[in-house]
């Protein structure tokens, strides 16, 4: 594979604890917005004759986490695509995580992270780190996006999936 060099990514959330956050009660309007997003996602992604495994929930989480760092026109466009404001989306997705993790014989373990290039110009605000920790339990990492980062991402995924997914990328 293209992953051969060993190096450590910088964990920007080191020392940040997951705090208390408001989980939505999963209202009809929030569910309708999420279903609308999922339908549009599939309509714009799936090609005839193609087999695809795609999780709208995972895509919503990824876009929700990145929306927490967006401002201005980027944030407005993201919220328009998602069908709700970022604060509502954060609460909605936390509500689903809570609901899916409760009781029964079902076991659900979600793992989220954001990876930034080491040469990222924007400053990462503590509020971005804290919000993503509170609502998504997400780690935020800074890395050079080279072969070493490939190895770090695969190690992160392997750890979070208890080895069920040993490798997710071959190269960056």
Pin down the residues of each PLM region.
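N-terminal low-complexity, Pro/Thr/Ser-rich intrinsically disordered segments
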Residues: 5-33
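Acidic/histidine-rich, surface-exposed loop or edge segments in extracytoplasmic proteins
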Residues: 15-25, 57-61, 75-77, 131-139, ...
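Active-site-surrounding "flap" and adjacent substrate/cofactor-binding loops of secreted or lumenal enzymes
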Residues: 19, 68-100
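Mature N-terminal segment immediately following signal peptide/propeptide cleavage
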Residues: 35-45
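Short helix-capping/linker segments at secondary-structure and domain boundaries
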Residues: 43-49, 67-78, 117-128
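Non-catalytic, conformational "gating/processing" segments within enzyme and secreted inhibitor domains
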Residues: 49, 91-172
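Active-site-proximal helix/loop microenvironment
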Residues: 52-59, 63-70, 168-172
């Amino acid at each position: 594979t293209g992953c051969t060099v060993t190096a450590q990514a910088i964990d920007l959330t080191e020392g940040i604890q997951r705090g208390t956050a408001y989980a939505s009660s999963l209202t009809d309007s929030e569910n309708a917005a999420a279903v609308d997003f999922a339908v549009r996602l599939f309509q714009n992604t799936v090609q005839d004759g193609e087999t695809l495994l795609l999780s709208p929930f995972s895509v919503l989480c990824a876009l929700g986490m990145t929306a927490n760092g967006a401002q201005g026109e980027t944030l407005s466009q993201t919220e328009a695509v998602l069908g709700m404001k970022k604060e509502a989306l954060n609460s909605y997705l936390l509500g689903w995580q809570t609901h899916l993790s409760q009781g029964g014989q079902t076991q659900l373990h979600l793992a989220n992270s954001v990876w930034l290039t080491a040469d990222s110009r924007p400053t990462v605000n503590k509020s971005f780190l804290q919000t993503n920790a509170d609502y998504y339990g997400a780690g935020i990492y800074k890395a050079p996006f080279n072969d070493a980062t490939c190895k770090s991402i695969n190690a992160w995924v392997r750890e979070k999936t208890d080895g069920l997914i040993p490798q997710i990328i071959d190269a960056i």
